[in-house]
A protein has these predicted regions:
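Alpha-helical packing segments of well-folded alpha/beta enzyme cores
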Residues: 36, 40, 44, 83, ...
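Basic side chains
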Residues: 15-18, 37, 74, 91, ...
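Short alpha-helical scaffold segments that flank and stabilize functional sites
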Residues: 40-43, 90, 147, 199
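Cap/lid segment of the alpha/beta-hydrolase catalytic domain
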Residues: 99, 104-194, 199-202
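Solvent-exposed, flexible loop/coil residues
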Residues: 29, 94, 185
Length: 202
């Protein structure tokens, strides 16, 4: 009897056993690495596709409050047409206003419903506390307490930017929708992160 394969999990496992990444580094020494890096970066940018057109940030600080040793702000800006980015910005109370301090962009990951909040040390829900305890997830808050300005953007599909699809993973839905248009969610999130830099420079 012929071998038959029905499982997509097994399919991907078998396909990857002999897979060699196209742009893996196979050289030796600094010169070879620099040439590989240039080629790999060009390929990465090609695969990411075009970034959106920038629009005026139209940034607003919706609130600014003292939170222990920190100043906690909610900022919203526009990163492109049809896309606004809510952020939490944390900075030490005694941070000089001369922009001499380093800033760190602190991004969230899964679970999608929590978004940026636990990264910024928000503890308004039991799930926030659980994520912070389990993953040491309030790293944006910790870095601000260590003297940095930190900004936590809400990445697309997470937290406030998460459309509810029931039990279906929003990342999958957004990937499929974007792929049809030749737009990738990762590219859009990188764009929003770049726009955080633009905001910090204002």
């Amino acid at each position: 009897m012929a071998n038959r394969y029905f499982s997509m999990t097994e399919y991907w496992l078998n396909r990857t056993k002999r897979w060699q990444p196209l742009m893996s580094f196979r050289g030796d020494g600094k010169e070879a690495w620099e040439a590989w890096r240039e080629e790999a970066l060009a390929k990465l940018l090609e695969l990411l596709g075009e970034f959106p057109e920038p629009v005026d940030l139209a940034a607003e600080v919706e609130y600014s409050v003292f939170d222990g040793e920190l100043i906690r702000e909610r900022v919203v800006f526009d990163s492109e047409e049809f896309a606004s980015v809510p952020c939490i910005v944390l900075r030490p109370k005694d941070m000089p206003a001369d922009r001499s301090n380093a800033a760190i962009i602190c991004c969230n990951g899964h679970p999608v419903n929590l978004g940026k909040d636990p990264v910024a040390g928000v503890r308004s829900e039991p799930e926030h506390n659980e994520a912070i305890e389990r993953m040491n997830y309030n790293y944006g808050e910790q870095l601000a307490k260590a003297g940095f300005l930190t900004i936590m953007p809400e990445l697309r599909g997470f937290g406030e930017r998460n459309d509810t699809y029931g039990r279906i993973d929003a990342c999958n839905i957004n990937y499929v929708k974007g792929s049809i248009l030749g737009i990738y969610p990762q590219t859009l999130n990188i764009w929003d992160i770049k726009r955080c830099v633009d905001y910090l420079e204002t």
